[in-house]
């Protein structure tokens, strides 16, 4: 059954005349008649009484008319709803981001980008999750951009031919812990075989966990750690460090306010234990929506943040 048949049927029902209905539908009368007959065959009953000059609906036609009207109305409304949805989706830029950057970096970065732009983004969607989940989101095409930390010793699933990236800024993972009564680190590095340092560790799905683990493998001497708590959320590790439960490698941007005198945290060692990292924005190499492409071009020519 073709929806054109329904439109033809309703035109004949309205005009009560095949010739005038055909003129209104901009088709020949024989073509209109064939399509109405095809609809009647599909329904299984005559819809019009053709015995008189003025065409009238049969009882079956009277029953079928509101069905045809409702069907076409629903189809047209559904089409308009989908078109509106597609239009909105095309104008929306979706970001995936690790939890730490979603909280500490994304809002100010986006504001700085938009302040320097002639047209701010009209639709923004942010999905905050673990690095592992964010990579999956990108690989499945559910986001256009991924904001994450990066280190060459810990390449991720997006490092390669299908994605490209921009470096937006830099940060440092610093080992921090609560101070003791004298202000010295309560859990100092590097520890030793008989006295490992209580370690507040990132879980396996965390991007910063991958980075920290890879970077520690190159440190001399290698820290002697005993994991006492695990989470993929840097803010939670910070809370546990403030509570004195161990040492955590945390972004300097996250803990800098806590490293001032009396702030609750101190460095657990000198600068040799620091891990420099970059902040990257990944995107697929395949072409994105026009709005997303314009945003990317703006970033390529703009400053870092």
Q: Which residues are covered by each model-predicted region?
A:
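N-terminal helix-turn-helix
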Residues: 1-70
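Short amphipathic alpha-helical coupling segments at ligand-binding clamshell hinges
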Residues: 60, 64-67, 105, 109, ...
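Central regulatory/effector-binding core of bacterial HTH transcription factors
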Residues: 90-155
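Hydrophobic hinge/microswitch elements
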Residues: 129-134, 139-142, 149, 205-267
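Acidic, Gly/Pro-rich loop/turn segments at junctions of secondary structure
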Residues: 129-195
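Short beta-strand->loop
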Residues: 162-170, 260-275
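Secondary-structure junction motif
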Residues: 182-220
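A late-sequence structural motif
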Residues: 266-305
């Amino acid at each position: 059954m073709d929806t054109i048949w329904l439109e033809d049927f309703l035109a004949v029902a309205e005009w009560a005349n095949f010739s005038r209905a055909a003129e209104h539908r901009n088709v020949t009368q024989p073509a209109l008649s064939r399509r109405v007959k095809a609809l009647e065959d599909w329904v299984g009953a005559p819809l019009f009484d053709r015995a008189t000059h003025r065409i009238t609906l049969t009882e079956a036609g009277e029953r079928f008319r509101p069905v045809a009207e409702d069907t076409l109305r629903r189809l047209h409304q559904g089409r308009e709803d989908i078109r509106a949805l597609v239009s909105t989706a095309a104008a929306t830029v979706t970001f995936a981001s690790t939890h730490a950057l979603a909280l500490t970096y994304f809002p100010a970065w986006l504001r700085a980008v938009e302040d320097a732009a002639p047209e701010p983004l009209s639709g923004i969607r942010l999905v905050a999750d673990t690095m592992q989940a964010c990579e999956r989101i990108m690989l499945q095409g559910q986001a256009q951009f991924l904001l994450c930390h990066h280190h060459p010793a810990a390449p991720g699933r997006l490092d390669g031919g299908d994605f490209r990236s921009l470096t937006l800024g830099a940060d440092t993972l610093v080992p921090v812990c609560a101070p003791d009564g004298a202000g010295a680190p309560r859990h100092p590095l590097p520890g030793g075989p008989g006295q490992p340092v209580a370690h507040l560790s990132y879980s396996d799905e965390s991007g910063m966990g991958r980075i920290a683990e890879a970077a520690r493998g190159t440190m001399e001497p290698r820290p002697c750690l005993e994991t006492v708590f695990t989470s993929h959320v840097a803010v939670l590790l910070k809370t546990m460090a403030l509570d004195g439960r161990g040492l955590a490698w945390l972004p300097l941007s996250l803990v800098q306010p806590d490293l001032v005198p009396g702030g609750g945290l101190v460095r657990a060692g000198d600068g040799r234990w620091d891990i420099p990292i970059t902040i990257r924005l990944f995107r697929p190499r395949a072409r994105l929506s026009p709005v997303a492409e314009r945003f990317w071009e703006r970033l390529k020519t703009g400053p870092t943040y």
